[in-house]
Design a protein with these regions (language model features):
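Short, charge/polar-rich alpha-helical segments
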Residues: 13-22, 77-88
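Immediate post-signal-peptide N-terminus of mature secreted/exported proteins
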Residues: 6-53, 57, 147-153
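Short, solvent-exposed, charged loop/turn and helix-capping segments
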Residues: 62-84, 99-104
């Protein structure tokens, strides 16, 4: 009976983790679409604006979803770590991605080496800040897994 209870608890912890990761995946999918939009030389202003608005909305919905998911059995550690990650995404989208949108929408004749350098610098900041935030989340996820006997691939 105890083994069954532990397995059930581990299964619930795995399901909880999967819900959070599914919410994160929604944001990542929108980031991929936005990055593709930046690469698309034929992207219209409307398409850029639409994808940017979708990205902003997904991040905000994900943050709200964490509140409805709640803590796992009174343990808020993974929820709080995910919220920190999603808030990092929110800051990147509201500031760094906004700069990339502004650059993307510049007329071709306005793009000079300074703009190109600025674009590359923003992309580098996004990469580094994302990496740091994701590493923090993965560490919290590993700790959560150890607590509830989960292994992550």
């Amino acid at each position: 009976m105890i083994v069954m209870s532990c397995a059930s608890r581990a299964e619930r912890a795995a399901d909880y983790n999967d819900r959070i990761v599914g919410t994160q995946k929604s944001i990542v999918d929108a980031l991929v679409v936005m990055d593709s939009t930046f690469s698309d030389t034929n992207a219209t202003k409307e398409w850029v604006d639409l994808n940017y608005a979708d990205l902003q909305a997904r991040v905000k919905r994900a943050i709200l979803a964490l509140d409805s998911i709640g803590p796992f059995q009174e343990d808020p550690s993974l929820q709080l770590s995910a919220k920190e990650l999603f808030r990092s995404y929110e800051a990147l989208v509201d500031f760094e991605y906004k700069k990339l949108v502004e650059i993307k929408l510049l007329p071709d004749v306005s793009v000079d080496m300074a703009i190109v350098d600025s674009n590359l610098a923003v992309q580098e900041r996004i990469f580094m800040q994302s990496k740091i935030a994701q590493e923090r989340f993965y560490k919290a996820q590993e700790e959560f897994g150890k607590k509830y006997n989960l292994e992550f691939e």
